[in-house]
Amino acid sequence: MGRKPSPRAQELPEEEARTCCGCRFPLLLALLQLALGIAVTVLGFLMASISPSLLVRDTPFWAGSIVCVVAYLGLFMLCVSYQVDERTCVQFSMKVFYFLLSALGLMVCMLAVAFAAHHYSLLAQFTCETSLDSCQCKLPSSEPLSRAFVYRDVTDCTSVTGTFKLFLIIQMVLNLVCGLVCLLACFVMWKHRYQVFYVGVGLRSLMASDGQLPKA
């Protein structure tokens, strides 16, 4: 009869599977979510400070705030009570909640990218001029009563056509990367859940077949 491996030897492969260069891979995703969420939030408030007439959808600090909440939950779960094979209802509930919030973060980031891309496409066509303490922009049109977009409290239109346009590009890039990180977090949570399930089924069937073998 072969010697059974010790419980410590059985735990080593499982611990190695949870780590990546000494750090748990889901933990890296949560840290990335936190860094990107803070960057998107700060940049959103900077964009809002350019003009009070900007809509909330054009300054997506709300997207960064949601991703920060997701990251805080992920850090708490991964640093305190994370187990690949959840053993309590609390661990399972936290993993499901983190999965759902990451999916929400993905949708919100993609929505922020769409809003920023739409506003950027408008700015690329605008013809702007300074009027008193505002910047008035119009789309090129042959109609004399074409719609005008007014950015209040702007003394120089270059802050709209230059600085704000650059902020929109950065927001699109940051939110796109943030959405991809949230998607990867959803995939990791799903993979851990169902990979552990099928591995557990395989181990039980293997143990059952070993138990049916005749003893030497």
UniProtKB/Swiss-Prot annotation:
PANTHER family reported for this sequence: SARCOSPAN (PTHR15260:SF1)
GO molecular function: protein-containing complex binding
GO cellular component: dystrophin-associated glycoprotein complex; plasma membrane; postsynaptic membrane; sarcolemma
Source organism of this protein record: Mus musculus
Disulphide bridges, residue numbers: none
Protein name in the entry: Sarcospan
Membrane topology: Multi-pass membrane protein
Keyword Transmembrane: yes
Transmembrane segments: 27-47, 60-80, 96-116, 167-187
